[in-house]
């Protein structure tokens, strides 16, 4: 149950992240060329690459690790709550899960912010040394791309905790027979084998 709940919670967050990536990318007219080595890849490769889609994939992949971490934390929390107090109903599990989720989301979004901004610290120092205004810095495509990564990644993480809590509350409120039926119908291993063929 724990792994299944975490999987569904992670996928819901990544779906939101991917959707927002396309929306924000279109609004801000991002072309993907702000990525490190993007020009080198285009000019040195014989393949026809869509740099914009690679940029979108980088955003989703960048957020996926933290999303999995939050989803597993929330799933484990719901499991422990139900294990120690089997009388808890779905509503009580959701309330307790949300209380834990607030703490988890705060630290994870900060981690994501620091991970993205840490890589561009020397670049920001260079901008400040050249006496560039904040407006000039924000209008640079490279900076805009990083801001979009941070915003989209954070929104995706904020979605993961409540979605995992809702999913976990539903799954852990079901009796064992219903869970076995869901697992047999889902057949995750069969789906993965079909994809890998």
Question: What do the predicted segments below correspond to?
Answer:
Residues 53-79:
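Oxyanion-binding "anion nests"
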Residues 69, 80-123:
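Helical hairpin unit composed of two closely spaced alpha helices linked by a short loop
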Residues 1-42, 49-62:
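Transmembrane alpha-helical segments that form the functional core of multipass membrane systems
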Residues 9-14, 44-61, 107, 137, ...:
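Pore-lining and gate-forming transmembrane alpha-helices of multi-pass membrane transport proteins
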């Amino acid at each position: 149950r724990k792994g299944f709940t975490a999987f569904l919670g992670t996928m819901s967050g990544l779906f939101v992240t991917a959707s927002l990536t396309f929306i924000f990318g279109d609004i801000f007219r991002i072309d993907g060329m702000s990525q490190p080595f993007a020009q080198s890849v285009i000019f040195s490769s014989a393949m026809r690459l869509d740099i914009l889609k690679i940029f979108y994939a980088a955003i989703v992949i960048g957020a996926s690790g933290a999303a999995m971490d939050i989803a597993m934390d929330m799933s484990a929390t719901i499991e422990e709550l139900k294990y120690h107090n089997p009388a808890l109903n779905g509503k009580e599990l959701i309330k307790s899960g949300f209380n834990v989720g607030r703490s988890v989301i705060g630290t994870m979004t900060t981690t994501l912010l620091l991970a993205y901004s840490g890589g561009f610290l020397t670049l920001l120092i260079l901008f400040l040394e050249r006496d560039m205004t904040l407006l000039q810095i924000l209008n640079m495509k490279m900076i805009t791309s990083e801001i979009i990564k941070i915003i989209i990644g954070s929104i995706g993480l904020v979605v993961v905790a409540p979605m995992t809590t809702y999913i976990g509350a539903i799954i852990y409120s079901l009796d064992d027979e219903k869970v076995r039926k869901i697992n047999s119908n889902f057949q995750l291993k069969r789906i993965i084998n079909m994809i890998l063929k």
